[in-house]
C-alpha cells in the first residue's frame, strides 16, 4: 500500500501515513491533512462546475495559512475562527441559508466535509481521503506527490510541534504563574510581528 489511515476511538479525527518519493513512510500532520482535503474539495468543485460565489471554507486560527493561499488563488471565501469545532459550527450556522459551507478543519486532525454533522467527523473524512487517493491514482500520482504539487503551486510551509512538560504540582504552579504573567504582561511583539 501507498497510504494508511486510522481514526481515533471516538471517530472524530483521521490520521494519515503515506510513502514519500523514496518509498519511506511519512506521517501527514493535521495541517497537511486539512490542506489536502480543502485543496481537493475546491479543485474538484471547480472541475465539476459546482463552485459558487457563496461557497466558503473555515479554518481555525492555529491552522496553516497555506489554506488561505489556496482559497485566495481560487477565489473562495475563507474564514478564520477560534480553535475548536464549536467555532467552525458557529460560522456554518451564521451563514446558513445565505452561503454554502464546503469544508473546514483544524491542525489537530479534525475535519468536516459537509455541514450536516457540525463537528469533526473521521468517517466522512476517511471517505473523502479514499476519494482523494483514487483521484491522485487516476492522475498517476501518490498522495505525497499531490501534497508536493500543492507546495509548488501555493508555497511551502514546515512546522514542528514542541511539547514542554512541567510535571507534578510544581509544574502546574509554574504553568499557572506563566499564564498569569502573560495575561498581566502580554508581549508587544512575537517573532517580529506586532
Residue ranges: model-predicted function:
Residues 1-16:
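N-terminal small/polar loop signature for handling phosphorylated ligands or for N-terminal nucleophile
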Residues 2-3, 24-26, 44, 48-194:
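Phosphate-binding and adjacent anionic-ligand microenvironments
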Residues 12-30, 67:
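Short Gly/Thr/Asp-enriched flexible loops that form oxyanion-binding sites at enzyme active sites
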Residues 29-41:
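Catalytic or ion-translocation cores adjacent to nucleophile or general acid/base/metal-coordination motifs
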